[in-house]
């Protein structure tokens, strides 16, 4: 089993905070194909190359547990490109998407048997876009709203307005998308607690099934980082961060959201009108289902959960990462180099073998972020003893808690989670 990630690095413009690999595409070369067309062709061929190599080594084609189109901005792709991608996924991974996919019949494409997420920018979601989205097997949309303040959106160099974000969600609802995730940011220069509370109120009014909320990060190499270095902006202080995070957790908890990962919240109780295809798929075969939880939200991101719970994943496209069979690999972060390599029928990636210490460290960094924490029985006796020895001072300070054979962060521990994880890792 594996999750499939498709990286679409194209953006109409760059946001000042983004450190992901992205590019603003140019047109075709003369009368030839556009960069988008050649890149999509290459991604389709990469899927075929990977399965051919797996078969040649005696392996089987991966059974997909989720599909995620991320970026960049997947909603910048033409529908012709999107249909080509999904037809290839259907053929390579033997998924039962309906054969009339790509038509504009009223009922649209049949639901995928798994979670299929597509990231969309609000300004791309026109009425026509939402209508045509029905012709794809997408059953979940992740939208980068970030804030409902037009002033802060301009600061981020986002192209949409708050009103456009609200309208986009409405159009997706009308198109039958019953599983919408909204991304928010907090900790903008000069942002007040009251302004953050207003953003939370706005997102709750939208009724999003899933909410991801992150503090604004100043990543080296971004325009935002250069503003920080020049003294033109200041980072949010620790005290305000804690207050904003507390308000986030408390408000969403009171509104019926499960806080299942440090930055992620999923609605626990569907409304009577919910007919999301994702609700009909119960991931009972995934090893990260937790029996001692009463009822995990059906709106948890299954794809992102695979990263946190040691499920293999396949990354397709420039700069995409893959993990599985004791190895981790990453594709070249250059579109032209990526296309050229695939044309020569070679995978443009580097890889590393994951030894026992690295796997332990990965477990600490990912599983500890989740509500369930680290399942101690999955560690060897050596690593379990090592972990619990280092955890003692954090347990005494109330930053970690051992419960039901699991080690997890407390609310206090989340505030200093990075330093705790660093101390628990094996060096």
Task: Describe each region flagged by the PLM.
Residues 382-396:
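Short amphipathic alpha-helical interaction segments
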Residues 6:
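Conserved N-terminal Rossmann-fold NAD(P)-binding element of oxidoreductases
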Residues 406-410:
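Minor-groove-contacting beta-hairpin "wing" of winged helix-turn-helix DNA-binding domains
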Residues 9-22:
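Local cysteine-cluster metal-coordination motifs and their immediate loop/turn environment
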